[in-house]
UniProtKB/Swiss-Prot annotation:
UniProt name for this protein: Phosphoglycerate kinase
Subunit field text: Monomer.
Organism, scientific name: Blochmanniella pennsylvanica (strain BPEN)
Keywords: ATP-binding, Cytoplasm, Glycolysis, Kinase, Nucleotide-binding, Transferase
Catalytic activity as recorded in UniProt: (2R)-3-phosphoglycerate + ATP = (2R)-3-phospho-glyceroyl phosphate + ADP
Gene: pgk
Length: 394
């Protein structure tokens, strides 16, 4: 991928608009996880060093498009950015609600343009809206990896009309990390895919089966693979219609099959836990976590890995009685010398729970984008940035 980078440009005297991914969880006006803002800060700080006229925008939540709703305002993000930037990078951080007809800067301020989803036509990549975004700036910086797979006005459409578009530091890091894991991995390469359903991650599993030396499946997904081998799964969640798909994947890739599991007759954090061999599962029991023998086998594989990609928990880790598999695998990845990359909301919750964030090589900010990159899909915003790079070479 050839793109112009923010580090390539002299932004002196330029109006700069950064599309970040500041879509953070907010409860009662308070941000409950600042991970995405923290990841976006290096690009914002660099832009502020290079230009006196910097604007940042993002979506937040799922408001009704075209309607203002205070619940989805970027105001909590503004308050967080004030603490991070005032007196060191800027004098003020100001939220601008009405900006489509133009904005005015005061000296030493960073402008945060209100939630793009308050603008009619954002999600449909509306041409008129895209032109209005483009009129605001001389340089557009796309840094929202988490939205890079979407064809929307603030991530893609603006690029058709702005004179210059480049990638931010975060977008570049995301693409490089995923490329390192998927396009040219150090081997053995181990992929871990958890979650409840094969159907939601079918293309991901298919893509990873072609690049991974070992494909470890967990959660409800593993139950479908067990059923494909004729194993008992009791009343566990599995997808009978996808058994032929699971059989095909088992033939094409080394997928370690569980030998023992933790089961219960009820789905509860207070449910009694029984560890037993797969062959001993009763019809009224459901698989909720890995057994010790299965965990040991997976840890042996991870200990030899040079590249590890992880998406999705291995068991019902939200319940203390069924989190051992996810916990042990988390710590094994943290201790490994392999290049490790993780992505997906539940997976990030797990690494936060077990306090291993600082021991992971790269934590992706993308959920759907992370999965779509693994699937091999083309990102419209990346294609747009590549076109700008090509046009500037000619």
């Amino acid at each position: 991928m050839t793109m112009i980078k923010i580090t390539d440009l002299d932004l002196t005297g330029k109006r700069v608009l950064i599309r970040s991914d500041l879509n953070v969880p907010v409860k009662n006006g308070v941000i409950t996880s600042n991970r995405k803002i923290h990841a976006s800060l290096p690009t914002i700080k660099l832009a502020l060093k290079k230009s006196k006229h910097v604007m940042v925008t993002s979506h937040l939540g799922r408001p009704i498009e075209g309607e203002y709703n205070a619940q989805f305002s970027l105001q909590p993000v503004v308050e967080y950015l004030k603490k991070q930037l005032i007196n060191r990078y800027v004098k003020e951080v100001r939220l601008v609600k009405d900006y489509l007809e133009g904005v005015n800067f005061m000296e030493g301020e960073l402008l945060i343009l209100e939630n793009v989803r308050f603008n009619k036509g954002e999600k449909k990549d509306d041409e008129i809206l895209s032109k209005k975004y483009a009129m605001l700036c001389d340089v557009f910086i796309m840094d929202a990896f988490g939205s890079a797979h979407r064809t929307q006005a603030s991530t893609h459409g603006i690029g058709k009309f702005v004179s210059l578009a480049c990638s931010g530091l975060l977008l570049q890091k995301e693409l490089e990390a995923l490329g390192k894991a998927l396009c040219n991995p150090m081997r053995p390469m181990v992929a871990i895919v958890g979650g409840s359903k094969v159907s939601t991650k079918l293309i991901v599993l298919d893509s990873l089966s072609k690049v991974a030396d070992y494909l470890i499946v967990g959660g409800g997904i593993a139950n479908t693979f067990l059923a494909a081998q004729g194993k008992k799964v009791g009343k566990s969640l599995y997808e009978e219609e996808l058994i032929p798909t699971a059989k095909r994947l088992l033939e094409n890739c080394d997928i370690p099959i569980l030998t023992d599991v933790r089961v219960s007759t009820e789905f509860s954090e207070t449910a009694p836990v029984t560890m037993k061999a797969i062959i001993d599962i009763k019809d009224n029991e459901q698989i909720l976590d890995l057994g010790d023998e299965s965990i040991t086998r997976i840890l042996d594989i991870l200990n030899c890995a040079k590249t590890i990609l992880w998406n999705g928990p291995i068991g019902v880790f939200e319940f203390p009685n069924f989190r051992k598999g996810t916990e042990m695998i988390s710590h094994a990845i943290a201790k490994s010398n392999a290049f490790s990359i993780v992505g997906g909301g539940d997976t990030l919750m797990a690494i936060d729970l077990f306090d291993i964030s600082n021991q992971i090589s790269y934590i992706s900010t993308g959920g759907g984008a992370f999965l779509e990159f693994i699937e091999g899909k083309t990102f419209p915003s990346v294609k747009m940035l590549e076109k700008h790079a090509l046009n500037n070479m000619n």
